[in-house]
């Protein structure tokens, strides 16, 4: 390296720590995302809406402990380590119980639980302390923080690598001349992940080429029927929105032909009795009915239709939106996805390289805490509504303060971090911080784990990919069966926290981008 | 119970009939409870004292034996309604599909029945496998109409795990049983059920055997709480439901309720047999842990078969860390005194050894060559405590057995896992040594694949004279110097000898006074010889047998077109005449791990003990030599002059230019495709070829600047001691092309590997040709090749283990019989001669019956020409 470049390196490390990604991500979690989760969580309703619990602002205090004699004092990490305590912060939430037709009541501040605190984060006592102050508090001044202390054991949350969500990934199945391919989108909306998979495959005897599967629908659906159910009523609409290319249009047209009788259309009635608007309505309805038969077989027709609509609104591409008026948008998205898939089949477009780092996202401690907190908070609200209902049933005056069991939330968070068993059944998310050596600690804090299974070969995924240049260390990986699946961030790599898509959209529009 | 001996003459495999179960049952189990208030077992429940007892205080009500001696006795449960046995659900389904739904005759015509019957009886006569015939019958017996009663047949499906559905109607186990009952004995034989040992309807259970308590012991926790075995829990469930079903049926409950309970009983019986059957939710313990029922006890790695029957824990074994010791012979193992005092050898006391044995007992269990136990002829075991040993000594007479400590010269079995081949377990002689590690000679590391970074090994002490004798004849280390795979054991020691030779050219003098190279007395060289000191070659000759004659080319031989033989300056032409090394160096070819010529010769001509002696003394000589001369290497050994660097640089530039020319030709369409290849493949191949040559050439240039006499790294590479020339040239000259999945690197960004290349660029650099050396800069693409190697080794170790297991399972029963044929356990001949030629690769010359070249050479040497 040229001598002058070292100056840049020094300047970089003057400004950034090696564990910045954890600390920034956790700060973002504490200051924005907790509030967001609470605001967007489903409100508690009791007795068919007679009572509702409204939530307000959440406040998080810096860590302190209540001793057995009732005295309160600040707690520093060292004390937590020595006394087998958890370094955690008090969370309180403004809540009030509204009775239908009742008067407005004041917000009450309720202690909802303890949040394990990441060392050196904004809510940590060590935040912003100087060298001498750190030594005075019993800390190693060179320690970078970024981990938690739960029951006196130091636990770091390992960064998880995942395939980029809300992005179409095209992949070929088998060899090129097998003519099979799949387009996958992992659509994420507030913690709910829906995997939508569109596959092009030659049907065994008769049937459609393009099939789609998504959560809560057993098996696969013909794509064209789904598009119709989403509001592309006529054949022409479906075909033209998929592609302008005649060849691709023909594939879609074939599928429409094949799947037509599944809709059980009454063509005479359509021709004679309906005007164009009615016909459109009729076509969409029959497509929805078909889906209804699949998702709620054996139920009443009304329920089937309701359920079908519910499923396509909530579980199909939820990142676009979950309201019924987003259906057309989803249809367009799917149509575009279809064209891309067909291009892969014809060889016009290359399938995506799954290991390309553009198709990967890293989930840092804040993101993982978000998942955890969302589930823990839901179980708190569930517990609350159970207790409120019980006190109502006993004829007592319900009280929010008494209904909250702060242990529910605290224990959920603590237990997950202490054992590494995260929500969604993932194990080993938090690990005992490696203190073999200072470098071991640093390396552990920058570790990136891929969720691919260790037992399968996955040769491609284990290889060093040139796009990891500058982001992932090319050298550091274990020699165990985890080889290439456990990685480490490059020394000078930073992880951004992500920003509000609306804000970005605005900026882009301001820069002159139309549509 | 004791003393009843019976010889097993044959074993029948069949099904247990309900009568069989009742006959062997000593108790009818009815109540689901286990103990009364006082904690005593009640009659007719799962802990019925007639089922046997655990704990020595009680006596079994059936056989009168005490706990621990009573083997236990089966009980039985009368099921209120029959249930299907999960293990036979598939078979039942198959049978039902092949018999008529009305008359239960097999769906074959009379003539077919006659024909198949004939074939089956014939096959049974000849003791052949019936499987193919039965398979054929099942395939044939699918008819839409019964040939016997003309009944229309419906399709029968198996709804996993145990529901049998005919058309849309689910058959109850009773109906299934009825159908199976109607099958005639004749038909049953055709369906693969031998009526002599089993009836098809026995696959539907009406009586459930209850295993004895010894099979499902309950444990008492410290708190005094009793904790029952999983099987007992499951049996309680079965009994409870059975009881309810019975009551409901007697009370005339509605059909629906009875069916529900029946279904539940079926579920419990199913999970009692197999709690991992597909299609049923596993029965769980209160804590949420799935119960471990019968199938789980047997299945898999932790199951009875693989864990307790194929593999067992043993006594008289030891395990500790291994460390090297050159002063231990190849066929020895250094055993820590601590271990030697713990694991013992049983010795029969005779008139001739009674005094020695007394000495052992006198030493007691804590002083090393002592004894731990004395076994009296009546089988009583007495510990030889310091306090009791006087009494023991007094009584000791021939016929007693003394379990004495391990001492020098005992034969033990030494093993390192994974035991991949027979050399992973070899018999060693004990050397009791201080400290706490097993010590082994460096030359036995390769067959065990051991190193000393924390490896642990196991030692087993033989407990019978027969085993000791068998090990001595078959398993000793020296008998495995030549093995089917490893040509011989040692590695790594030859460097020194060869190095001394190359540098001395037989002229430099090398005196060994402090340590005689040969431990054998009388062969130690006198300090002075004819007024001059010894040459290295003369010293080495001391470890060779006196009448050894051989000629071969050493590893350092450059394979010149015309061999200069003895005149070549590097001394690669090895001549040994009458045990004297005349010319040549001693390197890997002499006694390396795969190639050792001298060692090979000695094993074959003089036997394995001589080979052991040779190996030991040569190793000691080498160590003495290396202690004398010193041998080290540093990065300076990989330094080449500026001039060489320039030459290499020019050469690589030239090669890259040629690659560019090839690409240009390809782009202009001037490239001719090679036969059978596409244009792209041709280009790739040509580029690879050019770059490969370039790397080799640059290596050659670097090599030509290396000094063969003084450069230790080069000496190691050339003699084959450690490292290869390729490693050295990669360090000095050029790393070369990195390959991933067998080709140049293509993955990466869109149409290029890295963003600082042009899109679509095919040149050497952009596809992973590393121009620089390891000493210079490294680039990202270099890591890609490295990662692939790492992944490969990681995956391979995991996969090869499983492959090994499969291979062993497939081949373990093959043996070579006294006629030289390879036979399996049934006596079926696999090969008429072992390996088709009858040659033992370990005892032949490189797998051939005769090595003509060697013979000719020998004769020539012997005739003095």
From Swiss-Prot, chain A:
Molecular functions (GO terms): DNA binding; DNA-directed RNA polymerase activity; ribonucleoside binding
Superkingdom: Archaea
Keyword Transferase: yes
GO biological process: DNA-templated transcription
Pfam families: RNA_pol_Rpb2_1, RNA_pol_Rpb2_2, RNA_pol_Rpb2_3
Catalytic activity: RNA(n) + a ribonucleoside 5'-triphosphate = RNA(n+1) + diphosphate
Keywords: Cytoplasm, DNA-binding, DNA-directed RNA polymerase, Nucleotidyltransferase, Transcription, Transferase
Catalytic activity, EC: 2.7.7.6
Protein name as catalogued: DNA-directed RNA polymerase subunit Rpo2N
Family according to the record: Belongs to the RNA polymerase beta chain family.
Subunit structure: Part of the RNA polymerase complex.
Record GO cellular component, one term: DNA-directed RNA polymerase complex
Organism name: Methanothermobacter thermautotrophicus (strain Winter)
Role according to the record: DNA-dependent RNA polymerase (RNAP) catalyzes the transcription of DNA into RNA using the four ribonucleoside triphosphates as substrates. The Rpo2 subunit (Rpo2N and Rpo2C in this organism) is implicated in DNA promoter recognition and in nucleotide binding.
Main location: cytoplasm
Location in or out of the cell: Cytoplasm
Keyword tRNA-binding (UniProt): no
InterPro entries registered for this protein in UniProt: DNA-dir_RNA_pol_su2, RNA_pol_bsu_protrusion, RNA_pol_Rpb2_2, RNA_pol_Rpb2_2_sf, RNA_pol_Rpb2_3
From Swiss-Prot, chain B:
Residues given in the record as Zn(2+) 2 binding sites: 100, 103, 146, 149
Catalytic activity line of the entry: RNA(n) + a ribonucleoside 5'-triphosphate = RNA(n+1) + diphosphate
Chain intervals for the UniProt region annotation (Disordered): 500-531
Pfam families on file: RNA_pol_Rpb1_1, RNA_pol_Rpb1_2, RNA_pol_Rpb1_3, RNA_pol_Rpb1_4, RNA_pol_Rpb1_5
One GO molecular-function entry: DNA binding
Record-listed E.C. numbers: 2.7.7.6
Enzyme kind, highest EC tier: transferase
GO CC field: cytoplasm; DNA-directed RNA polymerase complex
Cofactor(s) essential for the protein: Mg(2+); Zn(2+)
Basic and acidic residues bias locations: 515-531
Localization, UniProt: Cytoplasm
Keyword ATP-binding: no
InterPro entries reported in the protein's UniProt record: DNA-dir_RpoC_beta_prime, RNA_pol_asu, RNA_pol_N, RNA_pol_Rpb1_1, RNA_pol_Rpb1_3, RNA_pol_Rpb1_4, RNA_pol_Rpb1_5, RNA_pol_Rpb1_clamp_domain
Binding-site residues for Mg(2+), renumbered to this chain: 451, 453, 455
Gene3D superfamilies noted in UniProt: 1.10.10.1950, 1.10.132.30, 2.40.40.20, 2.60.40.2940, 6.10.250.2940, 6.20.50.80, RNA polymerase ii, RNA polymerase II, clamp domain
List of residues binding Zn(2+) 1: 60, 63, 70, 73
Cofactor binding note of this UniProt entry: Binds at least 2 Zn(2+) per subunit.
Keywords for this protein: Cytoplasm, DNA-binding, DNA-directed RNA polymerase, Magnesium, Metal-binding, Nucleotidyltransferase, Transcription, Transferase, Zinc
GO BP term (any one): DNA-templated transcription
Record text on subunit structure and interactions: Part of the RNA polymerase complex.
Family: Belongs to the RNA polymerase beta' chain family.
NCBIfam families assigned: PRK08566.1, RNA_pol_rpoA1
Role according to the record: DNA-dependent RNA polymerase (RNAP) catalyzes the transcription of DNA into RNA using the four ribonucleoside triphosphates as substrates. Forms the clamp head domain.
Name of this protein: DNA-directed RNA polymerase subunit Rpo1N
Gene for this chain: rpo1N
